[in-house]
Amino acid sequence: MKLKFWREVAIDIISDFETTIMPFFGNPDGGKLVKISPSGDETKLVDKLAEDLILSRITELGVNVVSEEVGVIDNESEYTVIVDPLDGSYNFIAGIPFFALSLAVFKKDKPIYAIIYEPMTERFFEGIPGEGAFLNGKRIKVRKTPDEKPSISFYSRGKGHEIVKHVKRTRTLGAIALELAYLAMGALDGVVDVRKYVRPTDIAAGTIIAKEAGALIKDSAGKDIDISFNATDRLDVIAVNSEELLKTILSLLE
């Protein structure tokens, strides 16, 4: 299963997403509760529809799958696909145009390909370990540290509140995979979530893409993040475009 194969799979899924899921954008019916996911979160109708769409394409390949809504499907394959069928489902249901679908492919325990697709802008982000990060086919990099204070996405329940005094502005956009993609293309200087809340499915693709764009990615203890193949782990994530910003944030979390 070469890179070209996985890109074609992703493009097929995106095409189906545009046709099947996008008509529900801003429709309250998409927010109907369907079930409780293995991670303990509520699964809305649109989450289930998006997951069913993606799983129908991926499970036929005989690979392992990790998804927020269904948990783990172990087919004893050397390939594992971690998916977030609808990153930012609240935004989607509410008609807020900031959401995405994300997919990360691993061979054994090594990432080999990741995509994040933002339907509202038709931005197609790709991360290819060892080759780089791309937006609609063009290489992207995190932006150099600006002369002014940085701008970050920041999620907290009180921990690290002093961080806001050391940045120019903060945003809480509600779709962390897409926010990591925005870090990769230079729209944000950092993405920080210290709620012990995000799951591997939320950040698998985003961390691959951001890292390939030059981002530094750690947990709140300053350790590398290990993306596990399950849907229930809860993580902190600190992804930034410079060593200086990383040191500042970690020092304020001590």
Curated annotation (Swiss-Prot):
Q: State the organism named in the record.
A: Pyrococcus furiosus (strain ATCC 43587 / DSM 3638 / JCM 8422 / Vc1)
UniProt: substrate binding residues: D87, G88, S89, R171, I176, R195
Reactions catalysed, as given in the entry: beta-D-fructose 1,6-bisphosphate + H2O = beta-D-fructose 6-phosphate + phosphate
Give the molecular function GO annotations: fructose 1,6-bisphosphate 1-phosphatase activity; inositol monophosphate 1-phosphatase activity; metal ion binding
Q: What is reported on how temperature governs activity?
A: Optimum temperature is approximately 100 degrees Celsius.
What's a Pfam family in this record? Answer: Inositol_P
Positions bound to Mg(2+) 2 = D84, D87, D202
What are the record keywords, sorted? Carbohydrate metabolism, Hydrolase, Magnesium, Metal-binding
GTP-binding listed as a keyword = no
Subunit structure, as described in the record: Homodimer.
Cofactor names from the entry are: Mg(2+)
Q: What is this protein called?
A: Fructose-1,6-bisphosphatase
Q: Which Gene3D superfamilies match?
A: 3.40.190.80, Fructose-1,6-Bisphosphatase, subunit A, domain 1
Give the regulation of activity. Answer: Inhibited by Li(+), ADP, ATP and glucose-6-phosphate.
Q: Where does Mg(2+) 1 bind?
A: E68, D84, L86
Write down the superkingdom of origin: Archaea
Name its GO BP terms in alphabetical order: inositol metabolic process; signal transduction
Q: Does the keyword Metal-binding apply?
A: yes
Q: What is its EC number?
A: 3.1.3.11
Q: What does this protein do?
A: Catalyzes the conversion of D-fructose 1,6-bisphosphate to D-fructose 6-phosphate. In vitro, also has weak activity with inositol-1-phosphate, glucose-1-phosphate and glycerol-2-phosphate.
Q: Which family does it belong to?
A: Belongs to the inositol monophosphatase superfamily. FBPase class 4 family.
